[in-house]
Amino acid sequence: MTSEVIEDEKQFYSKAKTYWKQIPPTVDGMLGGYGHISNIDLNSSRKFLQRFLREGPNKTGTSCALDCGAGIGRITKRLLLPLFRVVDMVDVTEDFLAKAKTYLGEEGKRVRNYFCCGLQDFSPEPSSYDVIWIQWVIGHLTDQHLAEFLRRCRRGLRPNGIIVIKDNMAQEGVILDDVDSSVCRDLEVVRRIIRSAGLSLLAEERQENLPDEIYHVYSFALR
């Protein structure tokens, strides 16, 4: 549990905010120097997501998606804008959202809202989103704040909408990264938080073809 590794919650959040302020607004910056894995990541995410957009009567709509911890819009640009009519972005770092407006190019016109906010304080508009995409950011929330955020996301879904979490998974327990002020949880801890938020797990998949030295990365589809 994060309560065992985070001593000062306020400092946990403020330190992360300070860390991201000094990161360059580039794809490499967003991926901690692993910009070269972006295509592998996005191609797998597309396949994972499209199975829900193609299903029969319960298929997920393609009107509107929300990109959480969006940064400069790496996922918005390459995954969400090609599949959804409009996209909203939320990120804690103002400079990243400012950069997104040029990085996204012409298609960026279809980004409806740029919300500058930490996810612990963010509430998606109820019944608004077909897909809420949460990638490489859950480690910046405490267990309690993550469960509460997921509950708010559940209320933000349209009929047949889904939440996707894609993130690093620890081998065991919860590991604190003091550099960027984040935690990495093991699979069972994440599944437990998902259940506590009243969500069902529709699919779970491990990302393949990533460098050996980084954490295992898993995707979860939830409703």
From Swiss-Prot:
UniProt keyword list: Acetylation, Methyltransferase, Nucleus, S-adenosyl-L-methionine, Transferase
Record's catalysed reaction(s): N-terminal L-alanyl-L-prolyl-L-lysyl-[protein] + 3 S-adenosyl-L-methionine = N-terminal N,N,N-trimethyl-L-alanyl-L-prolyl-L-lysyl-[protein] + 3 S-adenosyl-L-homocysteine + 3 H(+); N-terminal L-seryl-L-prolyl-L-lysyl-[protein] + 3 S-adenosyl-L-methionine = N-terminal N,N,N-trimethyl-L-seryl-L-prolyl-L-lysyl-[protein] + 3 S-adenosyl-L-homocysteine + 3 H(+); N-terminal L-prolyl-L-prolyl-L-lysyl-[protein] + 2 S-adenosyl-L-methionine = N-terminal N,N-dimethyl-L-prolyl-L-prolyl-L-lysyl-[protein] + 2 S-adenosyl-L-homocysteine + 2 H(+)
Location within or outside the cell: Nucleus
One function term, GO molecular function aspect: N-terminal protein N-methyltransferase activity
GO cellular component, one term: nucleus
EC number(s) given by UniProt: 2.1.1.244
One GO biological process term: spindle organization
Enzyme class: transferase
Positions of post-translational N-acetylmethionine modification: 1
Purpose of the protein: Distributive alpha-N-methyltransferase that methylates the N-terminus of target proteins containing the N-terminal motif [Ala/Gly/Pro/Ser]-Pro-Lys when the initiator Met is cleaved. Specifically catalyzes mono-, di- or tri-methylation of the exposed alpha-amino group of the Ala, Gly or Ser residue in the [Ala/Gly/Ser]-Pro-Lys motif and mono- or di-methylation of Pro in the Pro-Pro-Lys motif. Some of the substrates may be primed by NTMT2-mediated monomethylation. Catalyzes the trimethylation of the N-terminal Gly in CENPA (after removal of Met-1).
Family: Belongs to the methyltransferase superfamily. NTM1 family.
PANTHER family per the UniProt record, alphabetical: AD-003 - RELATED, N-TERMINAL XAA-PRO-LYS N-METHYLTRANSFERASE 1
Protein name: N-terminal Xaa-Pro-Lys N-methyltransferase 1
Source organism per UniProt: Rattus norvegicus (Rat)
Organism lineage string: Eukaryota, Metazoa, Chordata, Craniata, Vertebrata
Gene expressing this chain: Ntmt1
